[in-house]
């Protein structure tokens, strides 16, 4: 049977987020491998006590809640997660920033198209006015030594985590629209 426009858009969006997630994993891995073992242990301890800016975005807490969420809800959460990275991604180094910014913008546009295609008169962001993300810590200030190291670590770890979430949500949403799919996580 022919592929629908919605399925095609989902395939493109999933491919884009997979690419971003792999990039996030590589950047995080490269950063970790540049650290001394002691530095890495310290950063891991600190990060476990901290949280990501995007934790303010209400999203499913486990795979069961993800499975029960509507396609539109998963798309809206994905959109917010991607949007929440537009500003923080600018604080990365030049090459990383260029790689990520364009990909985020493309992914955001793709998710917007998917939301429009899947809306049944539902409001896209019923509670978006309540979503006011605080600036991403001190990422935009020039930081010295250990603080800068910690911020880079947190930024890359959170970016990796959020791209994994978006990838999961888009894959579940895509699966739901596929007639013969078994959508288990």
From Swiss-Prot:
Its main location: secreted. The keyword Secreted applies. The keyword Metal-binding applies. Disulfide bonds join 52-158, 175-183. GO terms for molecular function: growth hormone activity; growth hormone receptor binding; metal ion binding. GO terms for cellular component: extracellular space. Signal peptide: none annotated. One of its GO terms (biological process) is positive regulation of growth. It is found in: Secreted. CDD domains: somatotropin_like. Pfam families: Hormone_1. Growth hormone plays an important role in growth control and is involved in the regulation of several anabolic processes. Implicated as an osmoregulatory substance important for seawater adaptation. Belongs to the somatotropin/prolactin family. PANTHER family: SOMATOTROPIN (PTHR11417:SF2), SOMATOTROPIN,PROLACTIN (PTHR11417). This is Somatotropin.
